[in-house]
């Protein structure tokens, strides 16, 4: 049939490149060696081959005649003109007769327990190591009675193995069963040696466990990914079977690998040469010479050491050592090769030498360049981790990474990238990896003087470790990076980014509505300070947080276990620890925008039931925002000019047990009203921030009568808020904070000599990057019962508020609010000057001043909603002041259903407490 492939041999099969064939000198047909029972190594000895068909007519094949014992081609005439070649019988005899310096002075002899990763990292792996016993080495082997026939049983007789014809120093292939037959025959026509039987994929692999040290250091064990496109290199388990006089000439193990040998039975002799620069240069020159086999390389160097490895001994040969091996008696040995981090530079140097010498792929480390890319990727991570942990990498690793970078760069050059592109893993970006690795090693070299962290101190090595350790180590590192990032405390930048998004979301909300039902009320009421003549300033700062509420839910009560931690932000626990220790440094000042066209004071009167309505609306619909940064980016009408001085201040401390008991007693009269709102109380945080959509005006605080205090008590009871205890002495002072998502008003009133003094101090604003300070002078018996106009301003009107208002009065009067109306009226105001200025801790505590400042970050605070203004209890503003904005929506409204009951309770409380202690509350 036309186009059909030609067929050969007695089997009439087409040509197969993987099968050895021999040509018949008579019929010129080709035959498979396995079909005609001719081994590959035997074909070299045949002078004329006759196939089975031709053999009948022309007789058997004719063998070559031996004419010498010192040349690879034994048919050459022995005229004494040609030198002895390596591996021949003459060469072996001469080698055994020579004397060499003993390696005893060179070798490091130690026990298995001493050969540790930490030792090699500290001392280096530069000299051969001899371990005379298996104890503590981690090496498991078959018993010394294990024979070549056992190897055949475990591996399989049909396995094709590489065999070296020692006399010719040529390799060939044969079946394992044929080699075993040869080995067991005492009459051996030639010397054959097996040195490359890798059995990791056979049953015999279970009988052998490699030394712990080689497994811990091995690149393949540590860095080769299981899902790699490339076939994983198996070079750790070799069985070496050699008959007497087997010889392997001088060589460096492929890829510059280190190697371990253990002689199970028999004996081997190693001829060792140091890998100095001079010796390596000589070796490369010798290897490329056409007369290589005629020159004994040991004669070219200064010293060649002889090391005898006896039965039961284990020898470790470091990277780059040039060595030859003679089998002085029949021997079976096990060994393995491994790349590692201790000598990266030398490994790369040996690999480049192999390429220059054009070493066949069969004798090179499988996928050497691919594993270098994997190692580079992992070492980049390792260096970053060492730097993150505050350790300087050891010198051997630093030098190795630099050598690796140089090699990777050379492989990526335009003129050679095509040659190396095949071994670049798909999941690696070579250019980016080289750049990042160069950057990290450069930064490591610049840092310099840090303690060196051994990679084997704690039983595992982040740079080189066993497969079990690798998986656990990488999983731990991965959890730490994603670290570990699920449990890691957020950084300031993380918090900033998160809350910037929150601010932007709030800025997209619709403008403020003038309906009181849309306002949010968030308030904090401090307990009265204990009288102290020596620590007034400290007491003011140490007012504790009593309650935190978000979305109408109590999330912290110091008298009850805190259970709902889910409402914390990611960094709130960290802030708990940090906020208590912070001290006030500066505050941010804010200039209020001017306003005009304020209406008459009569138009600002707001029925008390509207205040209750707004409170209920807050409890029903309000939500507290979790924010750590300022959301003071106002609308385009906001004319506030801000300056940042500091973001830190001391947060409030905890109150003592006595104050807690007093608080319990104070809460009894209003506990039933709190139950009306399902036990929900507004947050009592001394440091809760107010938003800065509009600059709030100063609140002026005239004194209160007993009736007004009782009315406020009932009013606050309606809002499910705590009521502070009475002031038992005229000198006692108390603090009260009003917060509703606005800069906090922290007021301290001291009663004495018929006068009241207001004081405030500034706290850190955790969700605001600025502080506001207002100062004003108050005359005696001034008290506020009218809402701040600026808190009722629309964004359009907020810019018209005057920057400075100051009014002084000689007398102030009070009007009692009718009980059926449930609101309070005040005819006169004491207007203090509102002037931003630098914060002064001392002046802030002096009497006659009222400061507006942002709330500080308290350890358990939850941040309040900053999207709407705060509705305040009804008051009056004097006609001399610019009239406040009129809110028509609040005039003439009837109380909502259910408010009558609340008013009845309020009236009852007012009657019960009519003759009680003088109390006040804001």
UniProtKB/Swiss-Prot annotation:
Biased-composition ranges for Basic residues?
Answer: 473-483
* Ranges where the record places region Disordered: 445-490, 565-607, 622-711, 754-773, 872-902
Matching CDD domains, A to Z?
PHD_KDM7
InterPro entries hit by this protein: JHD, JHDM1_Histone_Demethylase, JmjC_dom, Zinc_finger_PHD-type_CS, Znf_FYVE_PHD, Znf_PHD, Znf_PHD-finger
Q: What is its EC number?
A: 1.14.11.-
Q: Which organism is it from?
A: Xenopus tropicalis (Western clawed frog)
Its primary localisation, in coarse terms, equals nucleus
Query: Which BP terms does GO give this entry?
Result: midbrain development
| Cofactor binding note from Swiss-Prot or TrEMBL | Binds 1 Fe(2+) ion per subunit.
- PANTHER family in UniProt: PHD/F-BOX CONTAINING PROTEIN
Q: What is this protein called?
A: Lysine-specific demethylase 7A
Keyword Metal-binding among UniProt keywords = yes
Query: Which residue intervals are annotated with compositional bias (Basic and acidic residues) in the record?
Result: 667-683, 691-701
Q: Which residues form the JmjC domain?
A: 199-355
**KW Metal-binding (keyword) present:** yes
What does the record give under GO molecular function?
histone H3K27me2/H3K27me3 demethylase activity; histone H3K36 demethylase activity; histone H3K9me/H3K9me2 demethylase activity; histone H4K20 demethylase activity; iron ion binding; zinc ion binding
The record's similarity note reads:
Belongs to the JHDM1 histone demethylase family. JHDM1D subfamily.
The record places its PHD-type zinc fingers at: 6-57
Q: Where in the cell is it found?
A: Nucleus
